[in-house]
Structures are given as structure tokens and as C-alpha cells.
Amino acid sequence: RRVLFRSRVAAERDWLDLQQRHGVPVHIFRLAGIYGPGRNALRDAREGTARRIRKPGQVFSRIHVDDITETLVASMTHPDAGRIYNVCDNEAAPSEDVVAHACQLLGLAPPPVVPFEEAAKAMSEMAKSFYADNKRVRNDRIKRELGVALRFPTYRAGLDALFAAGE
């Protein structure tokens, strides 16, 4: 986990160095968990692969792919070289809540809640690292500086739209 964090920080530093050395304007985007068509809790629930893992107090921020696009376009119309932006929706939530909402939309019984300690026994180290920290991120800067108005401000709004689109 620390190695991944360090590599991300190093990558950001490299991009900012490129800007300094060559005058190439750079924006850095730190993306929350990405979902959208073909990659979402509805699909997982329908395929029977969704899991409701409970780790008390654990939440994750997410972002719909369409809102990522909106943010990137906004950054081009409001350039501020060297800025770092967190790109996420307005509501971090436990993954078990996201799965439960997807199942509700589909009319399926949600899978049983599995305590993290139990689920971790069968997880890869990478999967376990995902649960190591809360992933609550604030998006104030994209709204304030770039004027982004999220189409999907919550995972519920995003899943509802995906469901309505036949996902």
C-alpha cells in the first residue's frame, strides 16, 4: 500500500517536473472509484458476483465516468497549470450500501453481509489494501474552481441512471 502511494506521489511529481522543465501545462486528477456502463454494482449483482463486505466505519468515494469527462472538459476551459483535483461524487458510502441499492433496483435479494475479517481470508493482498483506509475524498475544488456540476452527485443517482438506461 505504501509502495503504491509512493509511486502515485512520484508520478505526480514527475508530471509537475515536466511542467517546470518544459513549460507544459499540467493538471493532476486524483480519481475516486470509477463506475459507469459495464462497470458497476448493477452488473455485479445481476451476475451474482456482488459482495456486501462490512468493515465498520469504512467508506469509499466514487465517481461516474461521465462526471470524469465533465471534469476534464471543465479543466480545459478553466486551465490552472499545476493544480491537483480530487474527482469524486458528493457522498462517500460503504460498499455494502451500494450493492444493496443495486439489488433493490433489480428486484434482487441482496447478498448476505460478510464481515471484513472473514472476507479478507479469501482476498488478495491488493484487495485487502483497498480496505486498509477510508477512501473519503472531497470534491470542493472541482466545483468551486472548475464550475463542475456533477450529473451523478451520489452513487444512487448514478446507479438509478444506469438502471434506467438498461444496464
Feature roles, as predicted:
Residues 9-17, 69-70:
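Conserved active-site helix of classical SDR/Rossmann-fold NAD(P)-dependent CH-OH oxidoreductases
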Residues 16-60, 65:
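NAD(P)-dependent short-chain dehydrogenase/reductase
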Residues 69-127:
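Mid/C-terminal beta-alpha module of Rossmann-like enzyme folds, strongest
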